[in-house]
Every structure is written in C-alpha cells, then in structure tokens.
Regions:
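C-terminal lobe and adjacent flexible extensions of AdoMet/dcAdoMet transferase-like proteins
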Residues: 222-267
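A short glycine-rich, Lys/Arg-flanked "PGG" loop and its adjoining helix->strand segment in the class I
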Residues: 130-142
Length: 267
C-alpha cells in the first residue's frame, strides 16, 4: 500500500508511539522564556505538540492562543477530532487551519512562530524555502520570534545512501504501540542526491494487529539536507536574525557532532 505519509495519521502516531512528546520540553521551555500570548505552529500535523503546548500556555496565561497550520486534510481532520476530546481550556486555546506554509495568509500576527520536528526539511527548493521563511516572518508581531529544529546530516548515513545498492535499516520496532496493534516496525532505504541535497527515504511500515491481520505501507519521503552556512544565508536573505543556535534541544554545541540544528530567530 503506497501513498503519502501525511495522508495516514495512524502511521504518524504509531511511529512516534514509544515517546510521542520527545521534543515537547524544548518547546515548553521556549514558551516559558519568551512568554508569547499568540503562537503559530507550522506543519502541526495531528496536534501532537499543539495540544500540550496549549495546556501549558493556558496555565500561565488565560488568554494564550495557539494556531496549528497544516496542508494535509487527513492530518487536520484527525487533529480536529482529537481536539474535541481535550479539556475545555485546551479547546478554547487551539485553532486548526488548513494552509501551505510556503504561501499561507492568516491576516494576523503572532509572538512566536514555530516549525518543529524537522518539517522545514520537506521544503526542497531554494525558492520554496525562501517563500516559507518570508511567509513566517510576515506573520511575526513586533518583537516576535521564529524557531525551528532540523535533523543534522548524518555523514555515515549519507555515505551509505550514495551506494548503488544502499542497505535497509530497521529503525523502529515498537510493541503494543496502540490499542489493537501488537507490533509496529519501520524499515528504511535511503538514497542521496548531492546535487540537490535531497535524501529520499523509502519507508516500509509493517503493522501487526491484535486480530492477526498484518499490513505493509510503503512511503517515499524526500528530505532536504541543510547545512549551517546554508541556513544562515537563507535566514539573512529574508531578514531573520539568529538569536540562539544550538546542536540539540538541550543546548548542545552546534558543531560537527551535532545531531540537530535548533534556531531561534528575530525578525
């Protein structure tokens, strides 16, 4: 069964089931430090981060609001249905909007715009990257901040991905990740095109259900592999200035060993 990963919220939930809030503490700390009243989350997906951030924000500020924007209708439908099961303060704080982060126009401004969980990597061309950054900056309130995190290129993985016959890796094996599912595995074959800095991951999702049924879903996912100097140039081109740079969610150095790029920028 093939298609887009973003058209199947169940797969997204299963692959993150072992630690669905792995990156949440960083975003909570950022909101605590900057004290925004209005937050815009781009590529918000199923609301994995949106809802807990709304809960934390409302504890601090009864007027706190967060807007989640995504272009996938299945993801938005899942998020809107899940929102109905959230506590009243979260329901009051959250609004979900459909839109493409390269070109949306909400006609409102935000104290903080965030792009979590490597989502900028799915914007592949320089033209689209600049459009996305410009659009995000245009939605910042005076004194607002723009923040994102990205996976740093793993050179051992890229070397394998350049091979004519790259290996398959099993990178997730989760037991009982959800009711009705006994086991979930994700295997991956990567191919890298250095001319475009595009890593194409062919993902094999195997779902073994409690009733004995099994199914395989195959998805191709293209990632743009960013490098720090490239990010600096893109940000400068749209008038965003990095205020904080680190190599991880806990302030790790941004060096050759960094596994992530975490930027907080002012506009």
């Amino acid at each position: 069964m093939t298609g887009s990963l973003w058209d199947n919220p169940e797969l997204y939930g299963l692959e993150n089931a072992d630690d669905p809030h792995f990156d949440l503490p960083f975003w909570q700390r950022l909101i605590e430090r900057r004290e925004p009243q209005r937050v815009l989350e781009l590529a918000s997906g199923t609301g994995r981060l949106t809802f807990p951030l709304a809960a934390a924000g409302r504890k601090r500020d009864a007027e706190f609001e967060i807007v989640g924007l995504d272009r996938s209708q299945p993801m938005l439908a899942h998020a809107r249905a899940a929102l109905l099961d959230q506590p009243a303060p979260v329901r009051a704080a959250v609004r979900m909007e459909e839109g493409d982060m390269r070109s949306f126009a909400l006609e409102e401004r935000f104290d903080l715009v965030i792009v979590p969980f490597n989502s900028l990597a799915y914007v592949h061309t320089r033209e689209d990257q600049l459009a996305c950054l410009r659009t995000a900056r245009a939605h910042l309130a005076p004194g607002g901040a723009f923040a994102f995190d990205l996976l740093a290129p793993r050179f051992d993985y890229l070397a394998e991905a350049l091979h004519p016959f790259p290996p398959m890796r099993v990178d997730a094996d989760i037991r009982t990740p959800a009711p009705g599912v006994e086991r979930f595995t994700r295997s991956c074959v990567d191919r890298y095109d250095p001319s475009t800095q595009t890593l194409t991951s062919t993902l094999y999702y195997d779902v073994h259900r409690s009733d004995g049924a099994s199914e395989r879903h195959v998805r191709d996912l293209d990632w743009h592999m960013y490098f720090p100097s490239e990010l600096e140039g893109l940000l400068a081109a749209v008038g965003l200035e990095p205020l904080e740079r680190s190599g991880g969610w806990n302030g790790e150095p941004l060096d050759a060993c960094a596994r992530r790029y975490v930027f907080v920028c002012g506009g």
